[in-house]
Amino acid sequence: MEKSYYFSKNELVLLLGTGNVTEIYGFQMPSESEFDDNAFTMALYQLVKRGCIEIVQELELSKDMKWMMEVLRTCKKVLSVVSAKGCEQKCWYLAQSGALVMELPILSEEVRVRLISQEKITEEIFAGTDLTEKPLENEATGRKIENFQSSIKKEGEELLENLSINMDTSQKDILEIEDANGIKNIVSVWDVADMKVHALVERLVFYEGSLGYRVLVLKDESRQVVFDSIEFRKKLQESLL
């Protein structure tokens, strides 16, 4: 199962309220002052027209919308991805029953919502990103190449030493960072939040280097640079699920 919907922010607020979802991590929603009676009426009209809400004795969500709210209520982890190209922000809400992906395109006020079944999550996480489809096999391969290319090893060391960011630095600010030559080599920032504690627990900064992508991993109090590899991606996917 994969289905896509496009909602205005006001329509999304109304759906969340109807589904008893009081907040969603990682996404900026309209304030109460922006959501007046007229906005409510227009949002309700559009949702009823599209079959997302039915008016009986009270507002009732369609089957897909109920599933969407269930994922938001029960998700264990949230992955927020901001890339230098493409979607301004993409949030993955990951639950046992499947995943819900919200995308806020740069040139649109509408939020794209995708419903993805559990068995499709693994292949979908890296699909549509700016990252290469064929990274290195594993970390060991990158380390072996470093032994013959000192410049590549130095590149990783400089990334760890010079990229002075932490968990409080915004994703968009990180993407604006330039190297010594004024080049923006950071292509994507991935934040992982644990919904048990409602807090950011891991940050991955993808940097385009001489040998594919390097990843600065911030977790707990540790900082390390690893190669983007099939091995790394598999471990990341397993940790998210």
Language-model-derived ranges and their functions:
Residues 4, 24-28, 54, 59-241:
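Non-catalytic recognition/regulatory regions in large multidomain proteins
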